[in-house]
Amino acid sequence: MAKAPNNAAAARVRKKVKKNVAEGIAHIHASFNNTIITITDRQGNALSWATSGGAGFKGSRKSTPFAAQVAAEAAGKVAIECGIKNLEVRIKGPGPGRESSVRALNNLGIKITQIQDVTPVPHNGCRPPKRRRI
């Protein structure tokens, strides 16, 4: 005999709570292969995020400044819906999407209050991988 459908599963689905935050931090991780943009509030809780690969770019096109720009626009639009007006930008990594992603956030109308470079630099720690020979 078949059981009646359980409505408890439908009751567990919650509506997404919309946060209203005026200031936040944009973490931009620009590697040589991809660019990841995460916009958080001051406490570090993620409001929105986007990547070059998630924006539809694959392979070597992910590592272009244009792909980083598209990803930054996608993350910025969701952040604006959360009420973000001012952003502090923290850039990590040597990738080609560093500058273009900051410009894209600025062009969306978000005021950028501070730009920090938080790229980790070793104080002569681990030995780096050997040079690539082509």
From Swiss-Prot:
Q: Which UniProt keywords apply?
A: Ribonucleoprotein, Ribosomal protein, RNA-binding, rRNA-binding
Q: Name one Pfam family in it.
A: Ribosomal_S11
Gene Ontology BP terms: translation
A GO cellular component entry from the record? ribonucleoprotein complex
Protease found in the keyword field? no
Question: What InterPro entries does the annotation carry?
Answer: Ribosomal_uS11 (IPR001971), Ribosomal_uS11_bac-type (IPR019981), Ribosomal_uS11_CS (IPR018102), Ribosomal_uS11_sf (IPR036967)
Q: Which SUPFAM superfamilies match?
A: Translational machinery components (SSF53137)
Q: Can the keyword rRNA-binding be found in this entry's annotation?
A: yes
GO molecular function ontology, one term from the record = structural constituent of ribosome
- Family note: Belongs to the universal ribosomal protein uS11 family.
Q: How does it assemble?
A: Part of the 30S ribosomal subunit. Interacts with proteins S7 and S18. Binds to IF-3.
What job does this protein perform?
Answer: Located on the platform of the 30S subunit, it bridges several disparate RNA helices of the 16S rRNA. Forms part of the Shine-Dalgarno cleft in the 70S ribosome.
Q: Which HAMAP family does this UniProt record tie to the protein? A: Ribosomal_uS11 (MF_01310)
What is the official name of this protein in its record?
Small ribosomal subunit protein uS11
Organism from which the protein derives: Herminiimonas arsenicoxydans
The organism's taxonomic lineage, starting at the top = Bacteria, Pseudomonadati, Pseudomonadota, Betaproteobacteria, Burkholderiales
